[in-house]
Amino acid sequence: MGDIFDLLIGEISATHEFAKPYIKLLEELALKMEIIYLEGNHDFNLARFFQRVKIFSLQEQPLKLNLHTSKGKNTDFKNSFITLAHGDIFLSPPLQFALKSLRNHYLLVFLNFLNQISFNSISNKILKNQNKKNLFYKIENFKNLAKERYKKYGNLGFWVCEGHYHQNLILDEKDVKYFNLASFAYERSFFVVECYQEIKFQEQKLRGQNV
């Protein structure tokens, strides 16, 4: 769902070394299962790193998926679609333009040059700020924001799942099916989607386990 790394950008060489073992693990896992990686605002322009993992850029989001059984059969239960996105879409035009511009290949090549001649001061500053980030900050009135964001997806009645805000909120109401993931770095948990007569998200905790 994006932001898997504090900072990983295809053109910024100083961000690559730390990520290499994790990229290798993801590629190994992709031999056993399909892995979808939605780029976030801290990790993007990643296609060069992966051969098996399926990368979806900001421009390719949201991703609408048809849920099916483990045997590959299509389901016929209600709300059998789910829409995935990192969450930094459907923002104000100026902010959306800024996010798109920051992913520009030529701009990033230039920034990489500046970073190298300044002994990685730019990337180090970003990483330092990331280390100070409050991973469990609660956004005031996020439930209302979630409902507004849900409307922007235009697929009312189906589930929308986002990251980005890291609020660990599930809204399962008549007209709103919205799930905002928590920060994995803080919660150390993930969710399994169970499909019976309706969609359920089962949290799996990793705290205290050797993983």
Where are the model-predicted features located?
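Glycine-centered small-residue hotspots that permit tight backbone geometry or close packing
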Residues: 1-2, 104, 182
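Core catalytic region of metal-dependent phosphoesterases/phosphodiesterases
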Residues: 1-71
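N-terminal short leaders/motifs
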Residues: 7-29, 104, 113-117, 130-141, ...
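Short, solvent-exposed coil/turn elements at secondary-structure transition points
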Residues: 41, 184, 205-207
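Conserved beta-sheet core of the metallophosphoesterase superfamily
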Residues: 54-58, 78-83, 88, 93-99, ...
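A short acidic, often aromatic-flanked loop/helix-cap motif at beta-alpha or helix-coil junctions
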Residues: 63-65, 186-187, 207
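Intrinsically disordered, low-complexity terminal tails and inter-domain linkers enriched
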Residues: 68-78, 202-209
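Active-site-proximal loop/helix segment associated with metal-binding centers of metalloenzymes
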Residues: 73, 84-145
